[in-house]
Amino acid sequence: MHKVAIVGRPNVGKSSLFNRLIGRREAVVADFPGVTRDAKEGLMLYHNHRITLVDTGGLWSGDEWEAAIREKAEWAMEGAQAVVFVLDPREGLSAADYEVADWLRRVGKPVIVVANKIDSPKHEVYLAELWGLGFGDPVAISAEHARGLDELLDRVMTHLPADDEDVPEVAPIRISLIGRPNVGKSSLLNAITNTDRAIVADQPGTTRDSLDVEWDFGGQRFVLVDTAGIRKKPDTAIEDYAIQRSQAAIQRSDLIWLVVNATDMGDHELKLANLAYESGKPVIVVVNKWDLVPDEELKRTEKDLNQKLHHISFAPRVYTSAINDYGIHEMLAEAMKLHDKWQSRIPTSELNRWLEVWQMRQAVPNFHGKKLKMYFMTQVETAPPTFAIFCNRADFVTRAYEGYLQNRIREDLQLAGVPVRLKWNEKGPYKRGKKDEDSED
């Protein structure tokens, strides 16, 4: 696997660049120097190449940690094929910058000079001084605004050796964000990707079409689909079209984020919950604007959520604030976990051991003295996990009992949080004759 080290003096934006490239907030970012002291590693994917990035502490900081930080940076250099040397040219080259440059010449690794905090083309006048370092043409970027990153990564790739073998492409997880207008879907998308790809405004219905955004998190590719807000009754032909686009996006997705406004929930949420449930896709309920709920209202808000979303009570919840970036990491981590469960397959032998124990311990439906008997169970599909159960009388299975059984399957068979489907079958070698049934009751 390729390895690239990010170095520079304190407070030039190394950690901001690291976080931007790996797609999550792993390193602590602040406006004062010396925040990062340890070397942090993160995995990113670029054009199907896996690259380990190492974020090092600020070199030549002049504080008590300087020797330890330099030692860790030297360790990071050992396996690196290239070095990204980050500077803030707006402040001019400092003595520490020249010290780092001299050290890099002794190390002897390929160096890409990065001029960070170049937020607009007019700031590129600051780049002239960097030529004097002797590392070639600097790359102008803004880690905060994601400017110039493709050019930087293309430059990095020129210094990395060719892969010995092709890395199998990681299939992306497609996630749709659904919710009624103005619950913060676009703000969440922008917070996740650290971009302004989606238009955000206070007026409901800003997003009229589905918007696909590709992103990487911990080596996993995602395609995030920000759908138009779904109203209970479309006001216009455009709204009607938006609903169709949203429903189509759900069908193309592997997973759904159902975004609700913690401070303003209505009957719309029940409709959306049903829409999500019927799709058979895993659903994560994203309770946005949670920071705006007063402490004394937390229990009541939870009660409202339970009532309006009872149809998908099994779905996990993540409490977020798009404005404060609260809960953003959990949204992606939970999505990866649910996606794995959604595609999982359980051995038939394990299913039938569970079924046997279940019937011994739990009461089953009983009609006029005759009991439901379940003889055999097997998984017939994944995504969602679907199980066929052979029984004596499928008509004995009530909706309430099936829901209860689905919940137990989720809890007992490590499928918590994902939809489960059951197919009842009276045919096959496990079907008993009427005479046999009567004799066993």
From Swiss-Prot:
<feature type="binding site">
    <location>
        <begin position="8"/>
        <end position="15"/>
    </location>
    <ligand>
        <name>GTP 1</name>
    </ligand>
</feature>
<dbReference type="InterPro" id="IPR031166">
    <property type="entry name" value="G_ENGA"/>
</dbReference>
<feature type="binding site">
    <location>
        <begin position="288"/>
        <end position="291"/>
    </location>
    <ligand>
        <name>GTP 2</name>
    </ligand>
</feature>
<feature type="binding site">
    <location>
        <begin position="179"/>
        <end position="186"/>
    </location>
    <ligand>
        <name>GTP 2</name>
    </ligand>
</feature>
<dbReference type="InterPro" id="IPR006073">
    <property type="entry name" value="GTP-bd"/>
</dbReference>
<dbReference type="Pfam" id="PF01926">
    <property type="entry name" value="MMR_HSR1"/>
</dbReference>
<feature type="domain" description="EngA-type G 2">
    <location>
        <begin position="173"/>
        <end position="343"/>
    </location>
</feature>
<dbReference type="InterPro" id="IPR016484">
    <property type="entry name" value="GTPase_Der"/>
</dbReference>
<comment type="function">
    <text>GTPase that plays an essential role in the late steps of ribosome biogenesis.</text>
</comment>
<feature type="binding site">
    <location>
        <begin position="55"/>
        <end position="59"/>
    </location>
    <ligand>
        <name>GTP 1</name>
    </ligand>
</feature>
<dbReference type="InterPro" id="IPR015946">
    <property type="entry name" value="KH_dom-like_a/b"/>
</dbReference>
<keyword id="KW-0342">GTP-binding</keyword>
<keyword id="KW-0690">Ribosome biogenesis</keyword>
<dbReference type="GO" id="GO:0042254">
    <property type="term" value="P:ribosome biogenesis"/>
</dbReference>
<feature type="domain" description="EngA-type G 1">
    <location>
        <begin position="2"/>
        <end position="164"/>
    </location>
</feature>
<dbReference type="InterPro" id="IPR005225">
    <property type="entry name" value="Small_GTP-bd"/>
</dbReference>
<protein>
    <recommendedName>
        <fullName>GTPase Der</fullName>
    </recommendedName>
</protein>
<dbReference type="InterPro" id="IPR032859">
    <property type="entry name" value="KH_dom-like"/>
</dbReference>
<dbReference type="GO" id="GO:0043022">
    <property type="term" value="F:ribosome binding"/>
</dbReference>
<feature type="binding site">
    <location>
        <begin position="116"/>
        <end position="119"/>
    </location>
    <ligand>
        <name>GTP 1</name>
    </ligand>
</feature>
<comment type="similarity">
    <text>Belongs to the TRAFAC class TrmE-Era-EngA-EngB-Septin-like GTPase superfamily. EngA (Der) GTPase family.</text>
</comment>
<comment type="subunit">
    <text>Associates with the 50S ribosomal subunit.</text>
</comment>
<feature type="binding site">
    <location>
        <begin position="226"/>
        <end position="230"/>
    </location>
    <ligand>
        <name>GTP 2</name>
    </ligand>
</feature>
<dbReference type="InterPro" id="IPR027417">
    <property type="entry name" value="P-loop_NTPase"/>
</dbReference>
<keyword id="KW-0547">Nucleotide-binding</keyword>
<dbReference type="GO" id="GO:0005525">
    <property type="term" value="F:GTP binding"/>
</dbReference>
<dbReference type="Pfam" id="PF14714">
    <property type="entry name" value="KH_dom-like"/>
</dbReference>
<keyword id="KW-0677">Repeat</keyword>
